[in-house]
Amino acid sequence: MLKNAQKDFIQRHIGPSVDEQNVMLKELGYQNLDDLIKDTVPEKILLKDDLDIGDPNSEYKALRKLKDISKKNKIYSSFIGMGYYGTYTPYVILRNILENPGWYTSYTPYQPEVAQGRLEMLLNFQQMIIDFTGMDIANASLLDEGTAAAEAMGLSYRISKSESKKVFVSKNCHPQTIDVIKTRAEPLGLEIIVGDEDKDIKEDIICGIIQYPGTLGDIKDPSEAISKIHKFNGKAVLACDLLALAKLKTPAELGADIAVGSSQRFGIPMGYGGPHAAFFATKDEYKRSMPGRIVGVSVDRHGKKAYRLALQTREQHIRRDKATSNICTAQALLAIVSAAYAVYHGPQGIKKIAESVSQLTKNFADKLKQSGYELYSNEFFDTVTIKTLDKTEKIYKNALDQGVNIRKVNSEMLAVSFDERKNLYRANQLLKIFNCSETIKETMNESLSNIPKNLLRTSTYLDHPVFNSYHSETEMLRYLKKLEDSDIALNKSMIALGSCTMKLNAVAEMIPVTWKEFSQPHPFSPVEQMDGYRELFTDLKNWLRSITGFSGVSLQPNAGAQGEFAGLMVIRKFHEKNGETNRNVCLIPSSAHGTNPASAQMVGMKVVVVKCDQYGNVDYEDLKNKAEEHSENLAALMVTYPSTHGVFEEKITDICELIHNHGGQVYMDGANLNALVGIAKPGNFGPDVCHINLHKTFCIPHGGGGPGMGPIACKKHLEIFLPKHSVIKDCGPVTGMGAVSAAPWGSSSILSISWMYIKMMGSEGLRKASQVAILNANYIAHKLKDSFPILYKGKSGNVAHECIIDIRTIKSETGITEEDIAKRLIDFGYHAPTMSWPVAGTMMIEPTESESLSEIDKFCSTLIKIKQEIDKIQSGEYDKTDNPLKNAPHTHVELTSNKWDHKYEREEAAYPSEFLRTNKYWPPVGRVDNVYGDKNLFCTCPSMEEYEDTAA
């Protein structure tokens, strides 16, 4: 009985009960799940043994175990800085966004009608960044500051007219930023010059990257260096501190072309490295070369203001190897939190925090000088670097003994950084550590600071009404609730997005993320203080080894696209070590996710596309011909398994063997790993390296477009090339590639989510989850096959964990498109499946294992009902242009207006199924005009008058 209690979570996570599974299996003609799997997955790759994960644990037991692990982390007061700072997450934001499934379980807002809430908050984020940087346009977040700086280099390289391949990076940049830039520059053949911006900019460059303020805290006027960068035909990039910009002149005023940085200190815990939302802002003229997603303002079909993702043709899912970046998952949830922080505090609140930090830092520095210390710079915002000379080691050790972490710059200098969480007590404690006799009695007059007068900010910021309206908790609470209710997330209904694995993000998995033991540590804390995190990392690595069959694991990549880049770089390093630098051709099937070709291009590989056959498999003959044609230069094959067409390819082992015979390596995109866990191990059937989407298979929520985690796993011969880190030396092998993420272990705090999931499921539950994911997908394919053709099936007639329904014949016969069906689904309260990918004119459905039989039946009956409406169009009962599909979605404003000119009844529009009468989602806007939005690009918050127009 007690042992069975430990399995309770398996039944909680998996939607269909055992009885419901049997009903579904019977309808498909199978006796049990094992028979279904044997008939669906190629026999030669089927796992013969159980995973080495252990028994399942109850929620309570797993939480107790993880709590014990977390307590092994020593929480010291951190003065380390380097881009990571203590901050307070206002509780109204913590509870109503960060801990709220209405926000964290939503998907990237590609369907704008069901995403107006998060789109509005992301637009607030963009407006906030534009205000602080003074730039014309900002994106809706990147992965971290190091990545953002590397993307700035990439933008500069794309638009450069110079023949130069040199990039200047100030030695005063954060070391982790320099590390990531070097990693990204190397495969592109770019030369990084690290030096002094006052002396070392002497020749043509692509761009110059300067930290503002510098990593040691010094504030220097970068105007002259920016002029020099422009003189030598480069773009000027300032890596900024967002809170400092409340006090400092904006990058735009100083002449910068691009501003990047992190919004972490706006309410996002350090989390031992993440997740945090980076920002990227630039001039209007470079908007079409920007990386990442951009939220813009458009109109719906009624002419009302509506938000949408703008300029999507820049992105990897459309432009593939010509994309501006391989970025897919970003940090939407964290951008939303930081924007909410600015909304809640407003300009006066932010100014107060900035001035408090600045004053405390100045007072501390003054007392140091009075005690005889010499400072590295007397002009600073929040960071003071002290020349401690032969006292360095003694002071550093004294700090550790007092439970305080400070930064050891070198053998003769220490640095301390203040933040929102620091107070007089902490400052005076630090003064004692430095053996100063005097203490700070009270803060100085707020007009006093150590910022140069010529760099003091005079321009305003956060002037928009949204930043000046919600400063009481009541008002903020209602604003956040209004936005949440505008959207569809998993707490409303199933989100059957193919290739996205929108499974349950259980509350028990989420709880540890905000524990102080996981949320408060600085990523560069001494490793001996972080035994809890190290144990969590070790467990997770061992489990991922068991699940994948690979030998080496790196947890550093903080998104799937980063994992792709890291995995391909590992392959590149392998060929380099073997003296085969000529190997630069990457074969990629035409069905691949857009990040694949974009990532291959980023590591300097030439993309050669391989055809797919009529059954959705890689065309083996075409692959064979291209492998032979490029044999001498073949670097890799990128393959997704099961395929993006939703089938288990029978020839996967032959495909891998073919590539190996031609000297190449096989990279497996792990986007569909949810169909393999406990069933087959990639390391056993041919691939050499793969990335793992923890935000898909292992339950990290999508957060409306991030965070994610994309660790990579590889075979023994590739382990020595896994990423290392310049700050934390024992992260990764000494022979490894440079850092791909700013933090050593990526977004460490959310790894606890995957730890909890795996611990609670155990070997048995993980296998069952994959089996039921495949069962649910095949049940849906079976239920829908008479209404919509299933485009691809495997050898036995089954699909994998997702299926593609073909809309192309419907479109040619009735004019109804996959978009019309997607928008009509909104009237039924459903987010659309994946549209027109990987095949145009189709929809890809992935139910995951977490959806119950009743929800799946409801979803299927909804699609069948929509097919009946299409039949009415074909028969002439419905008009071809004025029908419930072409006009979907229908808003409550439209349905309750005095005017109704449509050739169908209001009731047909509003309540097409009976279940909607008791649980109806009302979209806040009608169908959004995408063309208008891109032709009339507007990426800042609309005026209040325009908000009022929308509400009218």
UniProtKB/Swiss-Prot annotation:
Pfam families per UniProt: GcvP2_C, GDC-P
Catalytic activity: N(6)-[(R)-lipoyl]-L-lysyl-[glycine-cleavage complex H protein] + glycine + H(+) = N(6)-[(R)-S(8)-aminomethyldihydrolipoyl]-L-lysyl-[glycine-cleavage complex H protein] + CO2
An example Gene Ontology molecular-function term: glycine dehydrogenase (decarboxylating) activity
Superkingdom, taxonomy of origin: Bacteria
N6-(pyridoxal phosphate)lysine, modified sites: 696
GO biological process, any: glycine decarboxylation via glycine cleavage system
The EC number(s) this enzyme carries: 1.4.4.2
Cofactors: pyridoxal 5'-phosphate
GO annotations of cellular component type: cytosol; glycine cleavage complex
Keywords annotated in UniProt: Oxidoreductase, Pyridoxal phosphate
Entry keyword annotation includes Secreted: no
Class of this enzyme: oxidoreductase
Role: The glycine cleavage system catalyzes the degradation of glycine. The P protein binds the alpha-amino group of glycine through its pyridoxal phosphate cofactor; CO(2) is released and the remaining methylamine moiety is then transferred to the lipoamide cofactor of the H protein.
Oligomer status and interactors: The glycine cleavage system is composed of four proteins: P, T, L and H.
Protein family: Belongs to the GcvP family.
Protein name, UniProt field: Glycine dehydrogenase (decarboxylating)
Organism of derivation: Pelagibacter ubique (strain HTCC1062)
